[in-house]
Amino acid sequence: MKPAGVHHVAICVADAQKGLSFYRDVLGMTQLPRPDLGRGYWLDAGGQQVHLMESDTQPLGANHFAIRVDDIDAAITDLREQGVEVHQVPFIPGAGHQAFLRDPFGNLLELNQPE
């Protein structure tokens, strides 16, 4: 098998509408059309899809996913101005410039500006 890329990342959220407000309005993703699959939304994040799925219980899954940004300092400033707590970590050669935040449901997200 040779993967062609990542199609989407699925995230369980307790409230799909609140999730949409954060990922679309705060993080700037674009809402996509979605078939009738129950409560949830599909979003575009620069050509990669993020699927929000409303769930009363969050199953075990990935620890975090990373959002690539062109200017991490500008992204951090923008998020902080919107009241989001963002933790920037020291630069690690080979890993790029990184910062971490949590969505309203406690899911961990990484911002990554490649070297």
What are these regions (language model features)?
Residues M1-Q17, N63-F65:
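N-terminal beta-strand motif that seeds the catalytic metal site of vicinal oxygen chelate
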